[in-house]
Amino acid sequence: MKGFSLVNTIVATFIFTAVGFALLVMSDEGFRITKSSINANIAEANAVYALNTALEHLINGGNCEGSASGSVNDGSWEYTLYPTPSGQCFILASGRKDNAVRYKIAYAGFSGGGGLGALTINYLKGDEFSLQGSSKISNGGTNCPAVVYYEKKADIEYKGNAKIEGGIVNKKINIPSEIFKEENAFEDIKTYYKELYEDRFNNVSLPDVPLTTEDCTLEVGNSDCSLKNNEINCGNTKLTVENCTSVLIKGGKISLNINNGELDIPLVIESDELVSLTTVGDTSINDIYVITKTFGKLETGGSTTINGNVVIKADSFKNLGEDEQNIVLSGSTKVEGGMYISTQDSSLPSSGNEAKIKFAGSSEIGENFYFLGYGVDLHYTGGSGISGNIYIKTYHEYELDISHYGNFVGGSIYANCVSSDCEGEVEIHNGNLKPAEGSEFVFLSEGKELEAELKSGSGGLDGYFVNLSDNGELKLEIKAGGLEANGLFIGNKIEIEGGEKEKLTGSNKINGILVGKIVEGLKLGGSAEINGLVAALEEFDELNLKGRSKIKGMVIGNILEGSVSLIGNSEITLDFETINSFISKFGLEDFFKTLTCESEKGSGNLTLPQHLVGSIY
């Protein structure tokens, strides 16, 4: 039976009545133990056994009612439980051996909430469990415990004014059944977001490429072309498009420059390689369709307006160099429709180069952005934005790099990479990535890594971050400033990164629901905060808080391998209301239980220390 050293200490300490039978008899030969003293000692041991059996019954969730008895040490034991008006449980335990009888009387306190505390860990394996300065672990004024554990290696050490506010419960917790509605909810959450993503992504229809008549088609081989005043010039070949409903340039390696040009019909380019498509000045085009084996570069500037969609079907993207992008929208470029990028046959390539895309200046996309390909690096700066949704599906990697204040996307984001070694990354520099009302941001990875990184300044990101892989990692890297990461964070392994010593520092915050099998980096400093649920279904590496840092909600896990240390004014405070509000906000009611401290009078979970009245001989 585990966790009763404290009980036995109390039993030994608080004996207040003694001497029933003579324990030792003096003789000329010295001390001689009589049969009566042996029976008395056995009865005493049996009474302790009865008390511990009663406590074990309560610790394992038994009600404060009824009685039990049995045989032990060639004698007997018995206990009876009586609920009290205060909600405590009165224990009358007895042990017998022949004519010797001993009694133990104790009161046990109770708390509700399924025995969950601000810090709930089954196995505390570290060599240190210390609270220093004015730090504290608190039940938040509820009738829940502050600390719940099953086994711990180190005694709790207090220095200064540090304290634990609330009871300490010794009980083993089944973590999934306490926080989830179903035991396999952790995997169900992954499945739910994978299916949600697939439903949203697969429902996007790409615009059809218009059919172009032969007299509006220009076949040019390898050529540098230009467009001006409804006339396309490719070397010695020209085409006037006044009577066309669309125009097609068809060839090998094609470049097209549009300078202050106007084309009020769709432009279609079919090529082995699009070397470049450039617009400058006051340029207006209806739609752009590019169908090519290799895509080089599309660059817009000035006051370019595309009155419809930009559709790119490219089997591969050319590597133009480390600092060069394949697509650049800058100046006051406006795409009234959407931007759709995929392979020619809409399959997902397993090799190639990532597409590098940059939206800068005050460029805008009026509808959706869609990408299907090997990989994409999407970079937003300035006041650029997308009014619609973002849909991304890659084989190898995707990266959203945002340096932008305000909401740069008006709709939702759905992003995923599917190979076993793929990486998804969202990186924020002095900006915000927060969905508008009624929208949602879903970032997934089926591979080794999904990372959310907030680098500098102020701002933050909201969303659902789920690594779907059984071997994948979710990284939260928040480096400096007053930054916030808000949302649902799910992964086989979750790692919090930031400073060199403390992983979450400054006034940075993580708000929401964070659940992993393994969670690393719970090292907070400064005035950093985590608000909500932090759960490790298998293991935490350590728990360290300094300064004025705090965790408000609950930290719950099966194993904590390293030390538990709170220093300064740091604190861990139980707050189910905060957790439940995030469960509701993120629509997770189908997976998570509503946590509460409410309990019926006379029932609940045992809180140590017990209040022993004494032993009766």
UniProtKB/Swiss-Prot annotation:
Keyword terms: Membrane, Signal, Transmembrane, Transmembrane helix
Signal peptide feature range: 1-27
Keyword presence, Transmembrane helix: yes
Keyword Signal attached: yes
Subcellular location field: Membrane
Annotated transmembrane regions: 105-124
Membrane topology, from the record: Single-pass membrane protein
Any one cellular-component term (Gene Ontology): membrane
Protein name (Swiss-Prot/TrEMBL): Uncharacterized protein aq_1439
